[in-house]
């Protein structure tokens, strides 16, 4: 059976790995997952994200999680827009997360970016997830 919501699966894998205090989490790779992982690295929520080619030409995305004083850096990570109900917002309606302390992941015509970058660029898009 094929996976319907790859981004939701990615976020759930990260959440479960952090609750189990894992060092890293591996998952099948895609361009969307890689760009979301790169955004999490740039925002400081995860240590690194690397794509490796496995046997049979299957790419695997490995995300190294980040902890501070024994606690996970990511407090909450949740899917906002989902396959059954897509959530698109204009540049003025992009929500802030935890009064600016978190980040909303926005899929725009110029790629995946944070809510702050989308507002600065003056473009809206699909609100993929919230991370705080």
From Swiss-Prot:
It comes from Psychrobacter arcticus (strain DSM 17307 / VKM B-2377 / 273-4). PROSITE patterns: RIBOSOMAL_S8 (PS00053). HAMAP family: Ribosomal_uS8_B (MF_01302_B). Belongs to the universal ribosomal protein uS8 family. One of the primary rRNA binding proteins, it binds directly to 16S rRNA central domain where it helps coordinate assembly of the platform of the 30S subunit. The gene is rpsH. GO terms for cellular component: ribonucleoprotein complex; ribosome. One of its GO terms (molecular function) is structural constituent of ribosome. Part of the 30S ribosomal subunit. Contacts proteins S5 and S12. Keywords: Ribonucleoprotein, Ribosomal protein, RNA-binding, rRNA-binding. One of its GO terms (biological process) is translation. The keyword Repeat does not apply. It comes from the Bacteria. This is Small ribosomal subunit protein uS8. The keyword Ribonucleoprotein applies.
């Amino acid at each position: 059976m094929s996976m319907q919501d790859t981004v939701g699966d990615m976020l759930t894998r990260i959440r479960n790995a952090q609750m189990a205090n894992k060092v890293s989490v591996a998952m099948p790779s895609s361009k969307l997952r890689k760009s979301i992982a790169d955004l999490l690295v740039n925002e400081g929520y995860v240590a690194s994200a690397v794509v490796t080619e496995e046997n049979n030409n299957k790419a695997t995305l490995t995300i190294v999680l980040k902890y501070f004083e024994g606690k996970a850096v990511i407090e909450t990570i949740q899917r906002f827009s989902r396959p059954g109900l897509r959530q698109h917002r204009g540049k003025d309606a992009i929500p802030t997360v935890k009064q600016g302390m978190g980040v909303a992941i926005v899929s725009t015509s110029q790629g995946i970016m944070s809510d702050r970058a989308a507002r600065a660029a003056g473009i809206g898009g699909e609100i993929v997830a919230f991370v705080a």
